[in-house]
Curated annotation (Swiss-Prot):
CDD domains: AdoMet_MTases. This is Ribosomal protein L11 methyltransferase. It catalyses: L-lysyl-[protein] + 3 S-adenosyl-L-methionine = N(6),N(6),N(6)-trimethyl-L-lysyl-[protein] + 3 S-adenosyl-L-homocysteine + 3 H(+). Its EC number is 2.1.1.-. The gene is prmA. Methylates ribosomal protein L11. Pfam families: PrmA (PF06325). Keywords: Cytoplasm, Methyltransferase, S-adenosyl-L-methionine, Transferase. It is found in: Cytoplasm. Belongs to the methyltransferase superfamily. PrmA family.
Length: 313
């Protein structure tokens, strides 16, 4: 069976937004080729990236490649719709770079397995490791938390700096027995980590149906589905019960729109962990958090990505 590969030359900042667009248009898989992962100096020995070749990456910017089971007649419509959606991202103030689009035909066996070479076990901290389901991994110690991911339908592998920042913040700030809201859950990796770190239960929410299905599959894969309620929902709309922790790894443009709702659903003393924030938007997010009554307690960085931890006093 032949598939169509759509490649978009974009920026690191727009990677997740562009990936989401491609899934909405019917992509069965996405590969992100970012040269930064070759040269990144991580702030700890963790988060290692393995077995990557410079020949697989662009000289500048990022390639986001999607694979769709469409023929040439349907592909024209998909590309036109993609152009319209990319234009909307620009209207939202997101820098999408060149946003050039290239199309190629590929055989199913070329994409179904080749992308897996990019995804190996990643040590997020001395307690937590993310591994793909097809990789063998021996825990380094009995208390190590292993999160298994199958990113076949997902919006990420869990190794993006923003995800790692959120995981480390959860490990530091979430207490055993806490209840958690995971807004824009994607693969549900943060929800899974929260349960394995001792959360009582998690409500994982995403507006995208594909993300909801992916999240449900990953919670079952990790044996935590009985403690995680995955729901299709727009941010915190309609959510009333207060919890100890809210986590959101989404775009800064989205975070600033619902900080009032975060304050509303947090218990006094509760924690909001937000990421998906490029450094240039740090001040905007902090201003929105403070305006909503939240107190900034920590800012964490990996390269140009930021996670902000705030509390409701």
């Amino acid at each position: 069976m032949k598939w169509s590969e759509i490649s978009i030359h974009t920026t690191a900042e727009a990677t997740e937004a562009v990936s989401s667009l491609l899934y909405e248009l019917g992509a069965n898989g996405v590969v992100i080729e970012d040269p930064e992962v070759l040269y990144r100096e991580w702030d700890t020995p963790f988060g290692e990236i393995y077995q990557l070749s410079p020949d697989d990456f662009p000289a500048e910017g990022v390639f986001v490649k999607a694979y769709l089971p469409v023929d040439s007649s349907e592909l024209l419509d998909v590309v036109e719709e993609l152009k319209e959606q990319l234009a909307q991202l620009i209207e939202y103030g997101l820098d999408i770079g060149k946003a050039s689009i290239a199309v190629n035909d590929v055989h199913e066996d070329e994409w179904a397995h080749a992308w897996k070479k990019y995804y190996k076990p990643v040590h997020v901290s001395d307690r937590m490791t993310i591994k793909p389901v097809w990789e063998e991994y021996v825990p380094k110690h009995p208390d190590e938390i292993i999160i298994e991911m199958d990113p076949g339908m997902a919006f990420g592998t869990g190794t993006h700096p923003t995800t790692i920042l959120c995981l480390r913040a959860l490990e530091k700030y979430m207490a055993k027995g806490d209840q958690v809201y995971d807004v824009g859950t994607g693969t549900a990796i943060l929800s899974i980590a929260a349960i394995k770190l001792g959360a009582k239960d998690v409500l994982a929410m995403d507006l995208d149906e594909v993300a909801v299905r992916s999240a449900q599959a990953n919670t079952e894969l990790n044996g935590v589905h009985e403690h995680i309620n995955v729901r299709q929902n727009n941010l915190l709309d309609g959510i009333e019960e207060q919890v100890e922790v809210v986590v959101a790894n989404i775009l800064a443009e989205v975070i600033v729109r619902f900080t009032d709702d975060v304050f509303r659903v947090l218990k006094p003393g509760g924690t909001f962990i937000s990421s998906g924030i490029i450094a240039a938007r740090e001040a905007d997010v902090k201003a929105a958090l403070v305006a909503s009554g939240l107190e900034i307690v920590e800012t964490i960085f990996i390269d140009d990505w930021v996670a902000i931890v705030a509390k409701k006093r």
